[in-house]
Amino acid sequence: MSKQPDRLFSQPLEQVPDFVFNEDVVRVFPDMIKRSVPGYPTIVENLGVLAARFAQPGTALYDLGASLGAVTQSLRRHVRSDGCRVIAVDNSAAMVERCRQYLTAQDSMFQELLPVQVLEADILALPFEPASVVAMNFTLQFIAPDQRLELLGRIRQALLPGGALILSEKLRFADEQEQDLLNELHLDFKRANGYSELEIAQKRSAIENVMKPDTLETHQERLRAAGFSKVVPWFQCLNFASLIALP
């Protein structure tokens, strides 16, 4: 499947609409996220490696906010526990349709992959099966802040002893100087990947009302409040990080 370059915000828009994961975004999403999120390929590949340590035979592995299924593909490449299956969930019909196409292509290239179920659903209303691994890769930041604790609490209840939640998020920082520095470095990263000042400004306008990052401290406190016993940051690149939360 051909991957198109992200030019969604390359032309001046009279009014910049809020960002949505529609068909236009789906077409360019692999290019967009690679050029926008520092360390993204490293996070995705190692999510599978981490999951292999925590996956337990006969359990569900969740990819919540699966988008095009990059994390699901990583889980299927690395996890070998008997009887496991991946449940990939996204609320965007366009994402789900393309995700299924990518996973079908993966099935044609590899043997003995974990079975996968792709659901178009709202994770806030999703009943969770007993799970040994739950991955949320840049998903929680799009959930309304007042609904995040309840969601994490339900995930904690579904996690089996010895399992793990792997949570990746964009961070904000309480220290103003630290926030300004890492924000500017992130903008430099985007410029180095070919985004113009117009594209950067219009994308920021589109996403600022729908994505609400938290501080690392807020994530840690919320995860503990949800019932997790240990929170371990395992990766950070600029203002993007990933955590392992243990039940």
Swiss-Prot record:
GO terms for molecular function: carboxyl- or carbamoyltransferase activity; S-adenosyl-L-methionine binding. It catalyses: prephenate + S-adenosyl-L-methionine = carboxy-S-adenosyl-L-methionine + 3-phenylpyruvate + H2O. Keywords: S-adenosyl-L-methionine, Transferase. Its EC number is 2.1.3.-. It is an enzyme of class 2 (transferase). GO terms for biological process: tRNA wobble uridine modification. HAMAP family: Cx_SAM_synthase (MF_01589). This is Carboxy-S-adenosyl-L-methionine synthase.
